[in-house]
Amino acid sequence: MNHNELFEKSKEFFENRDIQNTLDHYQQAMERIDRTKLKNKSDYIQFLQSILKYCRENNLPEQEALVLRALGRTYSLFKQHAEAMKFHYQSLKLQKKLGKRVEIAEGLVFLAEDLEVSGNYDETVKVFREASEIFQELGKLRKVKEIKREIERLTEFSKEIVEDEYFLNKFHVDNF
C-alpha cells in the first residue's frame, strides 16, 4: 500500500473508532510519505486533532498519549520542530502519568531528535541518556546500543563545534 491508501485506511478505522489501528495505519502512511510531493499538510494535522478530541472526550488517556506523540512526529516530519517538541512533551507527561515505560523511552528518543535539530546538543544528550536508562531497565539492549552511538556522534560533533569556535575567536576570523 502506498501512503495515500494507508492514510485513507487510517481514516476508515477512525470512523469505526478503532484508535489503535487508526494510529498504526497512520504511522505506516507517514513512513511512506514523500515530503517533496506533499500539498495538504493541514489534512494530516486536522485528522490527528480530531482523533485527539475524540480521545479526550471519551477519556482514553493511553490513546491520547499516542495521538500526541503522532502529532509530534508529524510536525517533525513537516520540519516544524518547535511545534513537534510541544506535543512530545505533552505525550511524555501523560505517558509518565500512566507509567508506560516503553512509550516513555520511545517518546524521549523522538524528543531528542527534535532537540538536536534545534541545536541544543547538551539537552539532546541528556534526553537520550534518560531514554537509554529506561531501555536498559527494560532489557532492550539493541535500543541502548543505538542510543549510545547517537550520544557518541553528538558528543564528537559538539566537541568539533567548540574547537571551531575557539579557533575562530583566537585568530579573529570574524573580523575579516
Language-model features and meaning:
Residues 1-176:
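Intrinsically disordered, low-complexity regions
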